[in-house]
């Protein structure tokens, strides 16, 4: 090895030096800084370009405004501009404008499309049965009204007739049937369809399908009909396609005088339909009312909360009656709408009232309950000095002396802690059981349907424990519970000052309304002076009841109380009957008596300590439950209380609670 020499061609070996951690991280940081500088430079350049573009836009805008000011055009308000709006150019030549309309009718689905845009589609199960009606503006083609009438149910055909009669001449009418629409389609409705030019509508049969397009007072533009082949089946689906020529804007407008009221009217009538003479060109119905002031009005500054949803035609009718009542203060009225629906707010604006919308909370009964809570809370927040609030619903007619009735009785709520509310509604006040508009009662139930609520009761008791959104409870049933009422009573009139006209709602249909609401008596006499109002205070009322029972003639208990002959053919007398009532919640006989008297019998209402007061044959009729009522002492020793046994319940028959 002594003679070994390294090759001159091989590079000398040297140990590889490992890069330190410091140099490694320095290298990485240098690269990151370079990337960051590059991004920052790009961002600055982008901002510079944006600033330059914006400056150019501002200069162009100023130049355009300057040019416009040199040649100004007459200023146009909303209503004038609306009249000159042209709809989009439809197919056709020249000035002829045409809508393409499709209408579909079947067992489970209906739809309407206008120029390819679906304006109605209903395929929900167990909903939307009956005749769907759409109204289009004949000049613009926009939808002015959408309604569905369940003409399988009673009285819905009457509502349809009323609506169609209120549509202005010239409007485009579209009708289509879902499921079944003929069962309660009476002759009056068929005659109206015939007058519109329909051939199939008046002959509509069980489960037929039908689609119709026409102008009111003008030609039929298309119609299709499929007859059901058997009772157990439906007609084939029909699809109607037709052209609808549009008319000029001049034909669709009214030329009212330019006033603030008419501007409100024009705004309303250009958007919606089905409100009759309020949109008449020749003689429109007033939208401002001047009822007589109420002397010594004790409810002048009491806020009025109108609880509403998406039933604008109901709201329109209700507000007209409310604003016509003597002593009304429009500035105290607030309409609370459950949801952001446009047409109810249009109705509110038409009358120049305050409207508040809010997002619905909950479903079904819970949604209604939360709507009431939100509305009541908002009312007392809007009027922090108010001691009371009047609560109304959108489906009530209001009597002309509604505020007079409240003005004469509201002091009772201040002076008597044993009172829960004052209500304008008598649950048992039917045409054949109510007689005296000056007479008041105390009752253990809370009727609602036009009532006065004390602020302290709501803020201190009800609001803190109001049912939460997940509880599917009816708010009024909750308020009637003993835990809320706590032995307190409500003041009601013998003759109601409100009338429940609504037949469409969460817990309402035509059958139910026909049975329990249609024949309620409603006061139409103005200026009624209530009699002996202070006798409604707790102690005084007991004196009054004992006086009545002492003067009352005991009826013959061997007779059937359901027969007309049970009461003599007299007038102005006071009679009393004693029925079996073993304990406070034993209402077996009363329920059967209420049923045969054709008054409210689904649960117990209108009673005071086991006593019911009503009229029969214009005689004051008292019913006392024995032995539960303290007034049982007035029963003659020899008399036997009347007992009416309920009929045996049929197997599978629904109970009262299920029927409501």
UniProtKB/Swiss-Prot annotation:
BP terms from Gene Ontology: O-glycan processing; protein O-linked glycosylation
Chain positions covered by the region annotation Disordered: 68-93, 633-660
Cystine pairs: 254-281, 269-279, 421-490, 562-596
PROSITE patterns: GG_LECTIN
Assigned GO CC terms: Golgi membrane; membrane
Protein name: Protein O-linked-mannose beta-1,2-N-acetylglucosaminyltransferase 1
Modified residues (Phosphoserine): 7
UniProt remark on domains: The GG-type lectin domain is known as the stem domain in POMGnT1. It mediates specific interaction with beta-linked N-acetylglucosamine moieties of O-glycosylated proteins. It also interacts with its product, N-acetyl-beta-D-glucosaminyl-(1->2)-O-alpha-D-mannosylprotein.
Record-linked InterPro entries: Glyco_trans_13 (IPR004139), ILEI/PANDER_dom (IPR039477), Nucleotide-diphossugar_trans (IPR029044), O-linked_mannose_GnT (IPR052463), POMGNT1_PANDER-like (IPR039474)
Pathway(s) served: Protein modification; protein glycosylation
Region annotation Interaction with O-glycosylated substrate glycoprotein: where it falls in the sequence: 473-481, 506-512, 600-605
Family from the record: Belongs to the glycosyltransferase 13 family.
Region (Catalytic): 300-646
Reaction catalysed by this enzyme: 3-O-(alpha-D-mannosyl)-L-threonyl-[protein] + UDP-N-acetyl-alpha-D-glucosamine = 3-O-(N-acetyl-beta-D-glucosaminyl-(1->2)-alpha-D-mannosyl)-L-threonyl-[protein] + UDP + H(+)
Cofactor dependency: Mn(2+)
Subunit structure: Interacts with DAG1 (via O-linked mannose moiety). Interacts (via transmembrane domain) with FKTN; the interaction is direct and is required for normal location in Golgi membranes.
Cytoplasmic compartment segments: 1-37
Cofactor note as given: The manganese ion interacts primarily with the substrate UDP-N-acetylglucosamine.
Comp. bias (Acidic residues): 68-80
GG-type lectin domain: residues covered: 97-258
Annotated binding of Mn(2+), by residue: 395, 500
UniProt-annotated location(s): Golgi apparatus membrane
Keyword DNA repair: no
One GO MF term attached to the UniProt entry: carbohydrate binding
Annotated binding of a carbohydrate, by residue: 129, 179, 207
């Amino acid at each position: 090895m002594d003679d070994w020499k390294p090759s001159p061609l091989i590079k000398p070996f040297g140990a590889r030096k490992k890069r330190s951690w410091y140099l490694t991280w320095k290298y990485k940081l240098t690269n990151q800084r370079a990337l960051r500088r590059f991004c920052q430079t790009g961002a600055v350049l982008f901002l510079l370009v944006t600033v330059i573009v914006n400056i150019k836009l501002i200069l162009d805008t100023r130049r355009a405004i300057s040019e416009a000011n040199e040649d100004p055009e007459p200023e146009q308000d909303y209503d004038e501009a609306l009249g000159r709006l042209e709809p989009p150019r439809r197919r056709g030549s020249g000035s002829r404008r045409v809508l393409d309309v499709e209408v579909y009718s079947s067992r489970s689905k209906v739809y309407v499309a206008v120029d390819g845009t679906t304006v109605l589609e209903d395929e929900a199960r167990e909903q939307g049965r009956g005749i769907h009606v759409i109204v289009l503006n004949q000049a613009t083609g926009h939808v002015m009204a959408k309604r569905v009438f369940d003409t399988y149910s009673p009285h819905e055909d009457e509502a349809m007739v009323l609506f169609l009669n209120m549509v202005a001449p010239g409007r485009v009418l579209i009708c289509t049937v879902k499921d079944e629409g003929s069962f309660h389609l009476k002759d009056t409705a068929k005659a109206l369809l015939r007058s519109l030019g329909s051939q199939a509508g008046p002959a509509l049969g069980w489960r037929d399908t039908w689609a119709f397009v026409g102008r009111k007072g003008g030609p039929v533009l298309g119609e299709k009909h499929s007859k059901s082949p058997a009772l157990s089946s439906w007609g084939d689906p029909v699809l109607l396609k037709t052209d609808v020529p549009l008319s000029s804007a001049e034909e669709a407008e009214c030329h009212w005088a330019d006033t603030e009221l008419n501007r409100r009217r024009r705004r309303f009538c250009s958007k919606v339909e089905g409100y009759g003479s309020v949109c008449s060109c020749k003689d429109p119905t007033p939208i401002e009312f001047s009822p007589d002031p109420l002397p010594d009005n004790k409810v002048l500054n009491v806020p009025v909360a109108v609880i509403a949803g998406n039933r604008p035609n109901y709201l329109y009718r209700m507000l007209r009656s409310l604003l016509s009542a003597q002593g009304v203060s429009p500035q105290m009225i607030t309409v609370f709408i459950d949801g952001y629906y446009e047409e109810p707010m249009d109705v509110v604006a038409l009358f120049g009232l305050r409207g508040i919308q809010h997002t619905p909370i909950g479903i079904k009964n819970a949604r209604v309950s939360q709507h009431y809570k939100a509305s009541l809370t908002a009312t007392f927040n809007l009027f922090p000095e108010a001691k009371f609030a009047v609560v109304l619903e959108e489906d009530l007619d209001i009597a002309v002396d509604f505020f007079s009735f409240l003005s004469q009785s509201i002091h009772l709520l201040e002076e008597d802690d044993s009172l829960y509310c004052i209500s304008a509604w008598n649950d048992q006040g039917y045409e054949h059981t109510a007689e005296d508009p000056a007479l008041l009662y105390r009752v253990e139930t809370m009727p609602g349907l036009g009532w006065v609520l004390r602020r302290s009761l709501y803020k201190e008791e009800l609001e803190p424990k109001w049912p939460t959104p997940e509880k599917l409870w009816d708010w009024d049933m909750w308020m009637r519970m003993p835990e809320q009422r706590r032995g307190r009573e409500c003041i009601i009139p013998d003759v109601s000052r409100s009338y429940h006209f609504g037949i469409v709602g969460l817990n309402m249909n035509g059958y139910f309304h026909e049975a329990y609401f249609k024949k309620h008596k409603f006061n139409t006499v103005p200026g009624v002076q209530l009699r002996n109002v202070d006798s409604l205070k707790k102690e005084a009322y007991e004196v009054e009841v004992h006086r009545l029972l002492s003067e009352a003639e005991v009826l013959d208990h061997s007779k059937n109380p359901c027969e007309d002959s049970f009461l003599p053919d007299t007038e102005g007398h006071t009679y009393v009957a004693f029925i079996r009532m073993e304990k406070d919640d034993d209402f077996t006989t009363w329920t059967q008596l209420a049923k045969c008297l054709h008054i409210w019998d689904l649960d117990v209402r209108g009673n005071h300590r086991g006593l019911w007061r009503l009229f029969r044959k214009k005689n004051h009729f008292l019913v006392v439950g024995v032995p539960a009522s303290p007034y049982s002492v007035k029963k003659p020793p020899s008399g036997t209380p009347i007992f009416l046994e309920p009929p045996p319940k049929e197997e599978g028959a629904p109970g009262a609670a299920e029927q409501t």
